[in-house]
């Protein structure tokens, strides 16, 4: 969704459906979760606008109508985080621009056309003026990053009594460029350690028909996709430079059918569906029956307050393009043996609610993963890589890894309209591959948030986040100290023979926000103060080993020379205040 700052303006969202299981059959490529959000329609009666000026960004949005049959909404946002980050003394300076729009027009009483688009531009440069050991380490490996992404699509919908047909054509694009020089000295190309440009594009055409038959709803549809992935990389690997080019084209297809049922008294509901997908990457993936994806869910109200629910499903997802498009030195796609990744999910839940004001729920879940890509070089799952800047998947892989995740999630929601709302969730879980903790095995996640509306249009809100420490792999000091190895990537190498044998401490963060609104004739002015991590909590990472730049054995052959290393304490977290002004008119 755009990294730590979402690319989508939340003010424009009408509704969000978040699935962690029981995925709808009309959504492909889901293994972990599905975030399905729908934008509001523009205002058919009047034009409204909103401008926001904050400590880190400025934005402008609006919605209204172009004619009696056509409505619009839009949003554009520009950050100046680089100024804030420089003032805080951080070694990297991010900047982003994002925007979105939606046009909807009624062609007739039974036909409508919707066009929407999203765009995001990210640029991150380095603050080489920042001094200190922590900044020195981050600057030693972090590249400059330029990234552009956009999605544009059009949807035609025809209403025919009990039937609704939808035709959708969309295209998404991602252009990523990373550049890194040794010691950040770009005065000579001899200092270049990384120049990467990768482009991912996907064009999708889909048809869907929905039929309502009393208590039943039927859905069926099909889609075709064309994907293109290119990568042009020049990278230093130990003593030599590697030039890597790849160009991957994939044609894929899929179909689905699902049915939903709700009893006349609304106490029982059920959903069942099946989906299959295929593509022309290899023979295994062409065979649709090998990716048959059934799913089933039900819910039953035991009483007016108690409800029981459950779901089960087998889901598939294509491995990342970096893995599918990886070539060897002879230009041959070396990962042609990969398969669709799969997960078998089951869940059982119970919830209690008092009207719409108070709800308590608990759900147990089990996810069993199979056919996951395994790194031949490091003997760890590909899914456990990529929690830092860099490219993941450009290596030899085999589809043999298995894993599982299981746990229980509880939630409490309490709200009194116009006065306050309170939401909390606690998830206790384990995530493992071959009975070894995965990179995501934090054991627990607690989130508590609330907003209170005070008199005279004041409101105050807070959010507490508490997460268990993740496992980590110690560094390989012997390999990292080699001059050629260190100069190649400017950071230490992991000792994967000790994969995830250590664990970080837990971390908690508390955020506070205060809002005040003033209403005038045809205008609303709002002020806010937002303080993230008000307690100044520190997120601790494993101590990092770093080159001092001093060679211990300068007379040894170049391949045996070693840097004298030092350890740096790694922790992050600062109080981040922000103040802003919002105007609606």
Cite the ranges covered by each PLM segment:
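Gram-negative outer-membrane beta-barrel transporters
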Residues: 263-265, 366-368, 389-469
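Surface-exposed extracellular loop regions of Gram-negative outer-membrane beta-barrel proteins
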Residues: 129-134, 230-235, 304-346, 366-390, ...
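C-terminal beta-signal and adjacent terminal beta-strands/loops
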Residues: 370, 422, 466-489, 505-509, ...
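Short acidic/polar hinge/loop motifs at secondary-structure boundaries
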Residues: 1-18
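Structural signature of Gram-negative outer-membrane beta-barrels, strongest in the C-terminal barrel
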Residues: 118, 215-219, 223, 243-370, ...
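Predominantly transmembrane beta-strands of Gram-negative outer membrane beta-barrel pores used
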Residues: 15-26, 32-40, 47-91, 98-106, ...
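Outer membrane beta-barrel strand-and-loop segments of large Gram-negative receptors
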Residues: 196-198, 202-206, 246-256, 335, ...
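Face-selective signature of the C-terminal outer-membrane beta-barrel domain
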Residues: 104-122, 143-285, 354, 358-361, ...
């Amino acid at each position: 969704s755009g990294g730590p700052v979402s690319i989508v303006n939340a003010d424009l969202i009408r509704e969000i459906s978040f699935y962690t299981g029981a995925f709808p059959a009309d959504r492909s490529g889901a293994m972990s979760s599905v975030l399905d959000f729908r934008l509001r329609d523009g205002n058919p009666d009047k034009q409204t606008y909103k401008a926001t000026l904050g400590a880190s960004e400025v934005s402008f949005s609006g919605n209204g109508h172009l004619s009696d049959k056509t409505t619009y909404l839009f949003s554009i946002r520009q950050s100046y985080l680089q100024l804030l980050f420089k003032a805080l003394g951080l070694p990297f300076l991010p900047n982003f621009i994002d925007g979105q729009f939606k046009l909807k027009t009624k062609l007739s009483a039974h036909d409508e056309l919707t066009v929407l688009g999203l765009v995001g531009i990210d640029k991150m440069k380095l603050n080489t003026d920042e001094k200190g050991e922590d900044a020195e380490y981050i600057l030693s490996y972090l590249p400059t990053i330029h990234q552009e992404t956009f999605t544009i699509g059009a949807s035609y919908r025809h209403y025919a009594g009990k039937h609704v047909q939808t035709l959708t054509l969309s295209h998404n694009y991602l252009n990523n460029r990373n550049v890194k020089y040794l010691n950040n000295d770009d005065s000579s190309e001899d200092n270049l350690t990384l120049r990467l440009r990768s482009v991912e594009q996907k064009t999708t055409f889909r048809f869907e028909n929905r039929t309502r038959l009393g208590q039943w709803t039927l859905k069926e549809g099909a889609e075709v996709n064309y994907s293109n992935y290119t990568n042009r990389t020049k990278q230093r690997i130990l003593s030599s430079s590697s030039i890597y080019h790849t160009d991957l084209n994939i044609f894929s297809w899929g179909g689905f059918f699902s049915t939903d049922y709700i009893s006349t008294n609304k106490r029982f509901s059920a959903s069942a569906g099946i989906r299959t997908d295929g593509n022309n990457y290899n023979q295994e993936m062409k065979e649709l029956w090998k990716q048959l994806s059934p799913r089933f869910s039900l819910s039953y109200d035991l009483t007016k307050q108690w409800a029981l629910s459950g779901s089960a499903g087998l889901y598939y997802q294509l491995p990342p393009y970096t893995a599918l498009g990886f070539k060897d030195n002879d230009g041959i796609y070396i990962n042609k043996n990969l398969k669709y990744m799969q997960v078998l999910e089951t869940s059982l839940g119970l919830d209690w609610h008092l009207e719409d004001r108070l709800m308590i729920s608990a759900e147990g879940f089990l996810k069993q993963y199979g056919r996951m890509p395994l790194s031949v070089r490091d003997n760890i799952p590909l899914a456990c890589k990529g929690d830092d800047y860099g490219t993941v998947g450009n290596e030899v892989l085999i589809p043999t890894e298995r894993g599982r995740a299981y746990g229980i999630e509880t939630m409490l929601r309490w709200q009194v309209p116009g006065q306050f709302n309170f939401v909390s969730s606690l998830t206790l879980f384990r995530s493992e591959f071959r009975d070894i903790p995965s990179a995501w095995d934090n054991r627990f996640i607690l989130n508590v948030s609330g907003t209170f509306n005070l008199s005279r249009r004041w409101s105050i809100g807070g959010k507490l986040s508490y997460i268990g420490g993740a496992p980590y792999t110690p560094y390989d000091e012997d390999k990292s100290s080699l001059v050629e190895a260190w100069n190649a990537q400017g950071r230490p190498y992991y000792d994967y023979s000790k994969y995830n044998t250590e664990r970080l401490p837990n971390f908690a963060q508390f955020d506070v926000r205060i809002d005040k609104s003033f209403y005038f004739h045809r205008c609303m002015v709002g002020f806010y103060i937002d303080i993230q991590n008000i307690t100044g909590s520190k997120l601790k990472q494993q101590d990092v080993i770093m080159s001092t730049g001093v060679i211990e054995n300068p007379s040894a052959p170049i391949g045996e020379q070693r840097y004298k290393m030092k350890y740096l304490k790694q922790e992050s977290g600062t109080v981040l205040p922000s103040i802003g002004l919002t105007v609606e008119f």
